[in-house]
Amino acid sequence: MTFASILTHLDPTKATEAEAATATPLAFAEAFSAHVTALIFPMDSALTAPTPADDATGLLEDRAAEAFAATAQRRGLAHETRKRTSFAYGNGEAFADHLRVSDLAVLTGHGAPGIAAQILHHAAIFESGRPVLLVPQAQPLARVPQRILVAWDASPAAIRAIHGALPLIRRAAETIIATVSDDKALRPGQSGIELTHLLARHGAKTRFMALQRGSGGVLERLLAAASDTEAEMLVMGAVRHSPLRNLVLGSATQDVLSDALSLPILLAA
């Protein structure tokens, strides 16, 4: 199992951030000899219906496409660019459509995501059926991560995220399966121990870690464990809850989608 096709996004209005935005998708494309496609559109346009680009925006998109193609070509990568003018639907829908026929999306962001970025991330994760790697701009992955922390709660979303991350897990020097033991009750056969056995059969080097949630949230505890173990990436399932449920009980998924990231997180729903 590998990544044969990787999808990413470039905002043509942020040319100074292009190098950071493409660092991880290009590094992964190089590592897996994958084809990489960049969808190019202003992030703020995710809030609006598709319209013909004006001359200024069109020029920026052309420049972004040329710069991406030149960088990919220098690295010997099979690549493609698609601009907003080729989309028949909104940007979130268009990204999800393209992602369904890709193996992985890599989206790089700076700080806490705005509404437009949240819409794009939400569509990518919940409408595509494919894994999505969210990467903080300040902490891109220049290579395949060597230590990965997997959040395991025995949910369908969690196992989909793990299978989506298998090409990375198989290459990592160590994968840590972490269960927050006082978050959800797991039946026999659902524990992280069984999961370590499955991943070992796939050739992964794994170990199990039981965590106590404590007074903070689940994501907070997982990020603390990632820091303690020097993990370079977190893998977790994404679950869509109602706004009221998020407000009253909180949600690790909602925290990921609304807060600034401190390390790359791969999600799948």
Question: Locations of the language-model features?
Answer:
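Structural beta-alpha unit
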Residues: 1, 70-105, 202-234, 239-244, ...
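Short beta->alpha connector loops
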Residues: 85-89, 111-114, 155-156
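Membrane-embedded alpha-helical bundles that form conduits across membranes
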Residues: 1-10, 16-23, 27, 50-51, ...
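Small/aliphatic-rich secondary-structure junction motif
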Residues: 1-55, 127, 144-211, 231
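Acidic/glycine-enriched edge-of-secondary-structure segments
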Residues: 76-81, 121-125, 146-153
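N-terminal positively charged helical leader segments and presequences
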Residues: 35, 42-86
